[in-house]
């Protein structure tokens, strides 16, 4: 008991000392915000558990304007609720505001090397060079068009067979695309796949790691030195389990590619091309860059695609008029004798507008990903101190009435040159949905291509409406989960094939893309 009391007293004393030292460093002239309390600062002003943080921080815009601040245990956090502030700080001044905040739980949980957590340094530049070379523009992703063609067609087939398993099918499609592109890994076409299962569980861990305000150790780093048996420190056991899965998610598929490459059985992929281009030594910095940039592709690509597609299906059932107009465009431009392909997308302006509006109406990452300032800066009359965390409220920007007419409504027409927008369509959400400046998502072109093709094909062959139970429509409430990656709350739909010809087109997938033997067995035999 005496030992516990001593530890508590030491912890309290250390926290007070840490706060006192930070208090001396606080610079006058921060952006406005709620008055901080001694020691804890604005800890009690954080969103409560389960709250939608983008709506919580939107209140700051009403109270303080497009830029505001809070301080937690001496750490300054800048809340950005406006396009102009975000563009000025994170685009035009990206040389100053492109780092990432230090997140102790990321290291404890084994995620410190993923793209979203590493600071702006030579390692990040190495990641981005490798990723840009593979998927940095529309031309570089053309080598993946056949994979997108195959997996979106297979998605249609799975939905046709079991429409009630929509989310499972979306995860299978996204996982199959990303794992094939990144590692040359062929997933199980229908059954359980061990690698998809592993990475999905690891990504569930990641969602917990990045939960805003979810880990006190991020505000009081010295808590990491307390033993896991200490009262209130059971989070350390969770972090240890997360670390094991993060390591497995990174090491196992990388080892799979190396083995396949050595046996000359590999399918060309992101990792295999980097292995061929570089003399990569075991345990080297180059190997770390390859392994972790590859791992980052799944988090950035698969999670985004699943969430956006889920939102798309929900919103189509809510807006049948939009669905009908989109189907009329596809029927007129593509016809009924084939599925749309990527070459059609440039001739489908309404489909492209639907994709943009899905991205805008509910951004997949409503609060974006936090930036950090590498040196002190001045914005208008406000001081942005070195080490400040910048949090862009993407949802607020996507619903800014100064940029979007009837911002809460789902209106793809806002992006077309017609009616009130004949001269200037409204602001393209691609300009901010995928991040800012030097931290823009490097896989955005791949994600956009998959969304455009998937949306066009789904609407070409399916009608999406409310589910019916006991003769009555099941209402759909557009509610969303909190967190960095936000998805629609569970909902029910009716997904019916439009006609017999559409059914024939879907079922032709086996002729065009014969099912392949998966790599699940090879993965099971892998020894690392």
UniProtKB/Swiss-Prot annotation:
Membrane topology summary: Single-pass membrane protein
EC number, as in UniProt: 1.-.-.-
Organism (species): Aspergillus oryzae (strain ATCC 42149 / RIB 40) (Yellow koji mold)
Residues annotated as transmembrane: 2-21
Source species taxonomy: Eukaryota, Fungi, Dikarya, Ascomycota, Pezizomycotina
Keyword Lipid metabolism: no
Keywords: Glycoprotein, Heme, Iron, Membrane, Metal-binding, Monooxygenase, Oxidoreductase, Transmembrane, Transmembrane helix
Protein name: Cytochrome P450 monooxygenase ppsD
Annotated family: Belongs to the cytochrome P450 family.
């Amino acid at each position: 008991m005496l030992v516990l009391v001593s530890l508590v007293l030491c912890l309290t004393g250390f926290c007070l000392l840490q706060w006192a030292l930070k208090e001396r460093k606080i610079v006058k002239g921060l952006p406005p915000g709620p008055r901080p309390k001694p020691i804890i600062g604005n800890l009690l002003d954080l969103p409560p558990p389960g709250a939608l943080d983008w709506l919580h921080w939107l209140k700051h815009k009403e109270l303080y304007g497009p830029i505001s601040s809070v301080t937690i245990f001496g750490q300054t956090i800048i809340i950005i609720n406006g396009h102009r502030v975000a563009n000025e700080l994170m685009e035009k001044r990206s040389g100053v505001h492109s780092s990432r905040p230090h997140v102790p739980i990321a290291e404890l949980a084994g995620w410190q090397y993923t793209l979203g957590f590493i600071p702006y340094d030579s390692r990040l530049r190495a990641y981005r060079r490798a990723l840009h070379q593979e998927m940095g523009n529309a031309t570089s992703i053309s080598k993946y068009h056949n994979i997108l063609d195959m997996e979106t067609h297979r998605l249609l087939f799975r939905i046709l067979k079991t429409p009630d398993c929509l989310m499972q099918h979306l995860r299978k499609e996204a996982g199959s695309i990303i794992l094939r592109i990144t590692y040359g890994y062929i997933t199980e076409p229908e059954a359980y796949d061990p690698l998809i299962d592993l990475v999905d569980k690891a990504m569930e861990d990641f969602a917990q790691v990045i939960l805003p305000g979810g880990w006190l150790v991020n505000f009081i780093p010295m808590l990491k030195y307390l033993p896991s048996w200490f009262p209130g420190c059971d989070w350390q056991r969770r972090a240890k389990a997360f670390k094991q899965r993060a390591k497995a998610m990174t090491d196992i598929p990388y080892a799979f590619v190396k083995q396949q490459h050595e046996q000359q059985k590999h399918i060309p992929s992101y990792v295999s091309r980097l292995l061929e281009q570089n003399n990569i030594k075991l345990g080297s910095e180059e190997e770390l860059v390859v392994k972790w940039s590859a791992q980052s592709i799944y988090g950035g690509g698969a999670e985004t695609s699943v969430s956006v597609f889920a939102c798309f299906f929900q919103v189509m059932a809510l807006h049948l008029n939009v669905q009908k107009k989109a189907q009329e465009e596809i029927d007129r431009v593509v016809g009924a004798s084939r599925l749309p392909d990527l070459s059609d997308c440039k001739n489908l302006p309404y489909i492209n507008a639907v994709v943009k509006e899905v991205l805008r109406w509910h951004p997949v990452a409503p609060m974006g990903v936090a930036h950090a300032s590498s040196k002190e800066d001045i914005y208008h009359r406000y001081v942005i101190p070195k080490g400040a965390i910048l949090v862009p409220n993407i949802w607020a920007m996507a619903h800014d009435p100064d940029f979007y007419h009837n911002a809460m409504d789902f209106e793809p027409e806002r992006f077309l040159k017609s009616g009130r927008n004949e001269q200037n369509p409204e602001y393209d959400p691609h300009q901010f949905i995928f991040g800012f400046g030097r931290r823009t998502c490097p896989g955005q072109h791949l994600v956009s291509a998959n969304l455009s093709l998937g949306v066009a094909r789904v609407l070409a062959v399916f009608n999406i409406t409310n589910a019916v139970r006991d003769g009555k429509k099941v209402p759909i409430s557009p509610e969303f989960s909190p967190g960095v990656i936000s998805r629609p709350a569970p909902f029910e739909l009716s997904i019916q094939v439009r006609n017999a010809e559409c059914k024939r087109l879907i079922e032709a997938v086996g002729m065009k893309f014969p099912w392949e033997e998966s790599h699940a067995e090879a993965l099971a035999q892998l020894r690392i």
